[in-house]
Structures are given as structure tokens and as C-alpha cells.
Design a protein with these regions (language model features):
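Surface-exposed, glycine-biased beta-strand/turn segments
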Residues: 26-114
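Acidic, glycine-rich catalytic/binding loops that coordinate metals and/or anionic ligands
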Residues: 88, 139-148, 167-182
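Short, charged beta-turn/beta-strand-edge "cap" motif at the junction between a beta-strand
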Residues: 78, 109-111, 150-158
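Short, well-structured beta-strand-loop connectors
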Residues: 94-105, 138-153
């Protein structure tokens, strides 16, 4: 048998209140972590670096792609870096484009854990990723407007429940979506 502490390479901690516990889970260190992933041919999403520090000027305004409960934040999670935020919502809830842009990926399948996902390019190196979708409503090459429905919430890929995994990237570097929309 393996314990949860061993599985996630962590140690036991005791907290006196909820706020201290939550704060310890989401401590952010301003640094850039570069992860290189060996190609297995299973993921269409290229490896990216992660900016856990300052907000970057995107040159565009973003809206929330989904109203719901923030279930997982950007940053360190289970010994790895979570490159986006997870927003819980009911299966089939519409997901909208956070900004106008061109669809560069609209893919069904496991996709390296993202499941069915959409990637939009907004120009100037800015991209958004929408993962774990049930259905994809747009195709590669289409131009979408800000607020246009592009997919529906699901639990595809490496997922434990219905939610949207939402990422913002600038020149391949993952940014904290909470700096912009949540």
C-alpha cells in the first residue's frame, strides 16, 4: 500500500484555521519554471514555460469564459505546475471565447490530459486554451468573437469531474489567469 502523502510526495501538516490552510496551498513564488516534455505523439499541445510572477500586458481585454466555482488555481499542485485554472460547472454548460481570435486547435481525444480542447490565437503571441470539454462548437481556421460559444463543459482527458481547464499563454509562457479574469 502507498499512502496519499507518499503518492503526492508531500508531508502532513496541521493548521488552526481554513485561511491558513488555503494560503499554504496557493503560495506563489515569482519565478519562471521551464519544463521540457519528451514527445510521445499523444499531445498536440507544445511544452510551455510558466510565469508565476507578475502580470504581463496582453494588449487585449479578456472576459471570463465561464461562470462557476474556481476549483483549482494556477501554480504548484501535487508536485507539478498547474498551468491554468479550473472552473467547476455542470456538464454541457456553454464555454465562451475569452477574447476574439482564430481557432488553431479543435481536437477530440485524450490530448496529453486536456481531453477534448480548443486553442485560440489572439495575435501578438497570446493564446487561450479550453480543456476537458464535452463538445467542441468551432473548427480550426474559424474566427471567433469575444463571448461566442466555442465548447461545452465536460470531464474528458485527465479529469475528476466536470470543469473547464483555462489557460492563458504569451509567447508559449503560461500566465496566471487570475491576473486577468478570475
Amino acid at each position: 500500500k502507498i499512502t496519499i502523502l507518499e503518492k503526492y510526495n508531500t508531508s502532513e501538516a496541521t493548521f488552526t484555521d481554513v485561511e491558513t490552510c488555503v494560503a499554504s496551498l496557493y503560495k506563489e513564488k515569482p519565478k519562471v519554471v521551464v519544463k521540457r516534455v519528451a514527445s510521445t505523439g499523444r499531445s498536440a499541445i507544445p511544452p510551455s514555460s510558466v510565469n508565476t510572477g507578475a502580470k504581463v500586458n496582453l494588449g487585449i481585454s479578456l472576459i471570463r469564459p465561464l461562470s462557476g466555482t474556481l476549483t483549482s488555481r494556477f501554480g504548484s499542485r501535487w508536485g507539478k505546475t498547474h498551468k491554468g485554472v479550473d472552473i467547476g460547472a455542470s456538464k454541457g454548460t456553454k464555454i465562451v471565447a475569452a477574447a476574439a481570435g482564430r481557432v488553431t486547435v479543435s481536437q477530440y481525444g485524450y490530448s496529453g490530459g486536456y481531453g477534448n480542447y480548443i486553442m485560440l490565437s489572439h495575435g501578438n503571441g497570446v493564446q487561450t486554451v479550453y480543456g476537458h470539454c464535452t463538445s467542441l462548437l468551432v473548427n480550426v481556421g474559424e474566427y471567433v468573437s469575444q463571448g461566442q460559444a466555442i465548447a461545452t463543459v465536460g470531464s474528458t482527458g485527465r479529469s475528476t469531474g466536470n470543469h473547464l481547464h483555462f489557460e492563458i499563454r504569451v509567447n508559449g509562457i503560461a500566465q496566471n489567469p487570475q491576473n486577468y479574469v478570475y
